[in-house]
From Swiss-Prot:
Keyword Transit peptide: yes
GO MF: 2 iron, 2 sulfur cluster binding; metal ion binding; ubiquinol-cytochrome-c reductase activity
GO cellular component: mitochondrial inner membrane; mitochondrion
UniProt lineage: Eukaryota, Metazoa, Chordata, Craniata, Vertebrata
Note: The Rieske protein is a high potential 2Fe-2S protein.
Name the UniProt record assigns to this protein: Cytochrome b-c1 complex subunit Rieske, mitochondrial
Originating organism: Lagothrix lagotricha
BP term (GO), one: respiratory electron transport chain
EC number of this enzyme: 7.1.1.8
Mitochondrial matrix side: 79-103
């Protein structure tokens, strides 16, 4: 208004500047809108903000170690004086109760006692293990009825002189030969240097007139034929092994003599094989 009055010129004396305030609804709406706006929060810069980033920065990134030195900052140590240290004097030997005395003088006696206890324990454990193993092995052995069947009783009076009789014993052929006096003298006169498997005739018999053998050839397990071959004893038809009347190999591929089983004479007319 003042600039208009200044430029009016001749109308200036009759002009005057006035101002009037008029209330409007827009002012009330602006005041209400200003009052509804929340005030921004005020943060305390002195108080640390706890967040994942701030806490991760304070966490240790290397293994924790303890350092001791002159330039290391000191720490507070909390010690307790109310803890009782256990006393093991009741379990210790009298020779080592004195802290000011060396225990080397009694070390030999203490070691000897320890060795004695260890040895006694080892002997006891060994004996117990031996008993267990013996019982286990004996449980797998043949029973009494099986052992009884493993023996055969032969009546010698049924075998005439100069003849050979075959029996079945433990699934194998058993030869019982009643030798003549001529055969006994002939086999006893054989020199050991002539034999492939040197063995004297008297070492293979308990009674010279009775020759008991297992009738299995020592070459490949064939059954020899009695009273046959070049030496009048046994002959293997499979590969031509010749045995004499004492069952000793004399010719052919067989490497060993015929096997002599375990037997026992229970009388003049009875023998038990097995």
């Amino acid at each position: 208004m003042l600039p208009v009055a200044a430029l009016s010129g001749p109308f200036a004396p009759v002009l005057s500047a006035t101002s009037r305030g008029v209330x409007x609804x827009x002012x009330x709406x602006x005041x209400x809108x200003x009052x509804a706006t929340p005030e921004p929060p005020v943060l305390d810069p002195k108080r640390p903000i706890l967040s994942r980033e701030s806490l991760s920065g304070q966490a240790a990134r290397r293994p924790l170690v303890a350092s001791v030195g002159l330039n290391v900052p000191a720490s507070v140590r909390y010690s307790h004086t109310d803890i009782k240290v256990p006393d093991f004097s009741d379990y210790r030997r009298s020779e080592v109760l004195d802290k000011t005395k060396s225990s080397r003088e009694s070390s030999d006696a203490r070691k000897g006692f320890s060795y004695l206890v260890t040895a006694a324990t080892a002997v006891g454990v060994t004996y117990a293990a031996k008993s267990i193993v013996t019982q286990f092995v004996s449980s797998m052995s043949a029973s009494a009825d099986v052992l009884a069947m493993s023996k055969i009783e032969i009546k010698l009076s049924d075998i005439p002189e100069g003849k050979n009789m075959a029996f079945k014993w433990r699934g194998k052929p058993l030869f019982v030969r009643h030798r003549t006096q001529k055969e006994i003298e002939q086999e006893a006169a054989v020199e050991l240097s002539q034999l492939r498997d040197p063995q004297h005739d008297l070492d293979r018999v308990k009674k010279p007139e009775w020759m008991i053998l297992i009738g299995v050839c020592t070459h490949l397990g064939c059954v020899p034929i009695a009273n046959a071959g070049d030496f009048g004893g046994y002959y293997c038809p499979c590969h031509g092994s010749h045995y004499d009347a004492s069952g000793r190999i004399r010719k052919g591929p067989a490497p060993l003599n015929l096997e002599v089983p375990t037997y026992e004479f229970t009388g003049d007319d009875m023998v038990i094989v097995g």
